[in-house]
Amino acid sequence: MALTMSAKSVSARAQVSSKAQAAPAVAVSGRTSSRVMPAPALAARSSVARTPLVVCAATATAPSPSLADKFKPNAIARVPATQQKQTAIITGASSGLGLNAAKALAATGEWHVVMACRDFLKAEQAAKKVGMPAGSYSILHLDLSSLESVRQFVQNFKASGRRLDALVCNAAVYLPTAKEPRFTADGFELSVGTNHLGHFLLTNLLLDDLKNAPNKQPRCIIVGSITGNTNTLAGNVPPKANLGDLSGLAAGVPAANPMMDGQEFNGAKAYKDSKVACMMTVRQMHQRFHDATGITFASLYPGCIAETGLFREHVPLFKTLFPPFQKYITKGYVSEEEAGRRLAAVISDPKLNKSGAYWSWSSTTGSFDNQVSEEVADDSKASKLWDISAKLVGLSA
C-alpha cells in the first residue's frame, strides 16, 4: 500500500545519508539536536538530486548524572502482540498540543503512545511532568527535517513489532519573523520540508501498518490550521496562504526559490502554505486509500492555542497581547490541555471516525466537520501537489 522508493532518488540521496550519522535506534540518556543549514551553506541542486553542502547530523551530549538518573528515557520495547494496547504515534509529542494529546490518550489506560521527537530527554521530562504513567508511552527519535531520519524512524518502529492503530502528524515549525529562509538536511525550505514533506513521507511509509491495525478502526490524523483556511477571518490575515502554481515546490523549494508558489520568501506564509498542503494531503489520502484500506484520514483545527510554544519565535509584543485578545475579544482561546483532549477524541472517539473530515469546535455545538478553503478543496491542484511531493521525498506511484 505504501508508495515505493524511487531508485533514482534513492541513489541521489545515498551520498547524503552515507555522510550523516544514523539516528539512534533506541533512547539514550542524552539531548539530541539537529543543525539547520542557512541559505549560504546550500550547494546548487537539480530537481532530482539536491545534495546540500552541509549535512544535518544528530549529535548528543550527555546530561549531568543527576538528570540522567532522574529522567531515563523509555525506549520502545518489544511486547508480545497479545499484551499490546492500541498504539498511537504522535509527532512533536514533547510539548504543546502533541504532549497533551499523548497525556489524554495515556490516561484512558487503553492506549500506548509512541512519542516521536527529536530530543529524548525533553520528551521524557515532559511526560513525567504531566504525569503520564510508566509503561503508557515510549520515545523514538524522529527529526522530520531529515528524510533519512524519517526512514530510520519507520525502520525502528517496524523492528519493535508494535501494532499501529493511529498516526498523528502534529509536529510543526513556525518562523513568522524570519527574514531569510532556513533549510532542511535535504535542502527544502524548513517549514515546508518539516511540516509537509516530512509527514508526507512518514504517512506513506506507515500505511501498511495502519491498514493492518488489530482494532480495525485505524486513523491517520494531520493537524491543520485556521490560518491556512481562507474561509475564516484568521485565514484572511495577510499574508494569506496561496500555493499558486506550485512552481516553487516543483523546484524543491530551494534557496533560489523557497516558497511553494515561487514568490519571495515570507516566514509566516511559508507556515500557512505548509498547513494548506497538509490538509490537501489528507483529502488525497482519503480519496486514494480509504475505501481500499478502511483507514480514516482526517485533519483538525483544535482551537486557538494562544500560549503555545509554536509562537516561541514571534515578537515579544505579540506573545504578550495575543492570549488576552483571543480570550476576551475573539473568544477563540483554548488551553493546551483542552486542545489535547480534542485531538485525542479525533484519534479515538467512535463519533469522530469520519474519513475526509476537517474537525473544528464551537462553544455551542462542540465538534463539527468544517468547510475547507477553496484551495484545499481543489482536487486537481491537490493531485499535482501529491505527485510533486512524492517525487521530492523519493517515492513513486
UniProtKB/Swiss-Prot annotation:
One of its GO terms (molecular function) is protochlorophyllide reductase activity. GO terms for cellular component: chloroplast. Keywords: Chlorophyll biosynthesis, Chloroplast, NADP, Oxidoreductase, Photosynthesis, Plastid, Transit peptide. Its EC number is 1.3.1.33. It is found in: Plastid, Chloroplast. Gene3D superfamilies: NAD(P)-binding Rossmann-like Domain. Pathway: Porphyrin-containing compound metabolism; chlorophyll biosynthesis. Residues 1-57 form a transit peptide. One of its GO terms (biological process) is photosynthesis. It is an enzyme of class 1 (oxidoreductase). CDD domains: LPOR_like_SDR_c_like. It catalyses: chlorophyllide a + NADP(+) = protochlorophyllide a + NADPH + H(+). SUPFAM superfamilies: NAD(P)-binding Rossmann-fold domains. Pfam families: adh_short (PF00106). Transmembrane segments: none annotated. PANTHER family: PROTOCHLOROPHYLLIDE REDUCTASE A, CHLOROPLASTIC, PROTOCHLOROPHYLLIDE REDUCTASE C, CHLOROPLASTIC. Phototransformation of protochlorophyllide (Pchlide) to chlorophyllide (Chlide). Belongs to the short-chain dehydrogenases/reductases (SDR) family. POR subfamily. This is Protochlorophyllide reductase, chloroplastic. It comes from Chlamydomonas reinhardtii. The gene is PORA.
